[in-house]
């Protein structure tokens, strides 16, 4: 069973937004602050713990269960490894692409962890969830009330914001039955125009906060090449301080809300307001024309 005092959080976001990188760097900073943490990777790529473990990919619960014949044949120490600053690391895994339900791994892994006492002596459990889908098995941490606080990693790019709004819609669906709440938007900067201001505006419309703006810095890629978090690779760097600031905000966050997702028309109007999209009067004129022709 799960201790009621544990804060169960989840990171969602569009595929490729840097969700796993952002979550691992933030959780590493939280561990530095003395928080006892377990990461449960809920992405079939099994990349949610690699920076913590200095590894390519951790062996997943589903992979080992398939080898043994059943998840009941596994031992906890086989699927739960210890990484940076004592962070416990588990990857749920998934089936081969195109075969079966990838969300099944999440359900199997969480049930196994609960039944085998993995949630003991923890302050935080973090679920790192695949891409922009909040349906089926991937919604399981939300639907079953496992994750109580959701943090959406986004940016000033249109599709990242579109995904954030869709995820907010999924949270709203289960907010009353499962008690899940939105903890805030994390802007993982892509250096688009007026990005921080844009995400602040989106957050307000979604009835939440931009909990932190993470600037773009090449040191993140340098650390990733070494399979390390920034906090471990370059602890005194400015980027390391950004992740520590975000970590502190999550630890102290008490602004947990039921989101108010917006319609596509309102999202497009917001993008037009900030110059990401052209307004309708110009839209028809620029469709299919190269940049030179629209100057």
UniProtKB/Swiss-Prot annotation:
Any single biological process term in GO: nitrogen fixation
ADP-ribosylarginine: modified positions: 104
A UniProt-annotated Pfam family: Fer4_NifH
Needed co-factor(s): [4Fe-4S] cluster
CDD domains documented for this protein: NifH
Annotated positions binding ATP: 13-20
Keywords: 4Fe-4S, ADP-ribosylation, ATP-binding, Iron, Iron-sulfur, Metal-binding, Nitrogen fixation, Nucleotide-binding, Oxidoreductase
UniProt-listed InterPro entries: NifH/chlL_CS, NifH/frxC, Nitrogenase_Fe_NifH, P-loop_NTPase
Comment on bound cofactor: Binds 1 [4Fe-4S] cluster per dimer.
Any one GO molecular function term: nitrogenase activity
EC number: 1.18.6.1
Residues the record lists as binding [4Fe-4S] cluster: 101, 135
Protein modification: The reversible ADP-ribosylation of Arg-104 inactivates the nitrogenase reductase and regulates nitrogenase activity.
Chemical reaction(s) catalysed: N2 + 8 reduced [2Fe-2S]-[ferredoxin] + 16 ATP + 16 H2O = H2 + 8 oxidized [2Fe-2S]-[ferredoxin] + 2 NH4(+) + 16 ADP + 16 phosphate + 6 H(+)
Record note on quaternary structure: Homodimer.
Biological function: The key enzymatic reactions in nitrogen fixation are catalyzed by the nitrogenase complex, which has 2 components: the iron protein and the molybdenum-iron protein.
Family: Belongs to the NifH/BchL/ChlL family.
PANTHER family: LIGHT-INDEPENDENT PROTOCHLOROPHYLLIDE REDUCTASE IRON-SULFUR ATP-BINDING PROTEIN (PTHR42864:SF2)
Protein name per its UniProtKB record: Nitrogenase iron protein 1
Gene (UniProt): nifH1
């Amino acid at each position: 069973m799960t201790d009621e005092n544990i804060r169960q959080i989840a990171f969602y976001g569009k595929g490729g937004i840097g969700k796993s990188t952002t979550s691992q760097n933030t959780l590493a900073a939280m561990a530095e602050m003395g928080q006892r943490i377990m990461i449960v990777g809920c992405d079939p790529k099994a990349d949610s713990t690699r920076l913590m473990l200095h590894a390519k990919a951790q062996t997943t619960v589903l992979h080992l269960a398939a080898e043994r014949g059943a998840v009941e044949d596994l031992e906890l120490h086989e699927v739960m490894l210890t990484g940076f600053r004592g962070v416990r690391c588990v990857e749920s895994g998934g089936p081969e692409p195109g075969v079966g339900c990838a969300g099944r791994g999440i359900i199997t892994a969480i049930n196994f962890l609960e039944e085998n006492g993995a949630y003991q002596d923890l302050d935080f459990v973090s679920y790192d969830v695949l891409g922009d889908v909040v349906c089926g098995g991937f919604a399981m941490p939300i639907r079953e009330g496992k994750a109580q606080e959701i943090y959406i990693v986004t940016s000033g790019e249109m599709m990242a914001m579109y995904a954030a709004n869709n995820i907010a819609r999924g949270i709203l669906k289960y907010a009353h039955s499962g008690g899940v709440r939105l903890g805030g938007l994390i802007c993982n900067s892509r250096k688009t125009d007026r990005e921080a201001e844009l995400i602040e505006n989106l957050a307000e419309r979604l009835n939440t906060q931009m909990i932190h703006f993470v600037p773009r810095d090449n040191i993140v890629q340098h650390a990733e090449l070494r399979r390390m978090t920034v906090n471990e690779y370059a602890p005194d760097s400015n980027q390391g301080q950004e992740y520590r600031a975000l970590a502190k905000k999550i630890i102290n966050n008490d602004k947990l809300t039921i989101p108010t997702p917006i319609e596509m028309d309102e999202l497009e109007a917001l993008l037009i307001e900030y110059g990401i999209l052209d307004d309708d009067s110009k839209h028809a004129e620029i469709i299919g024309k190269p940049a030179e022709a629209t100057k």
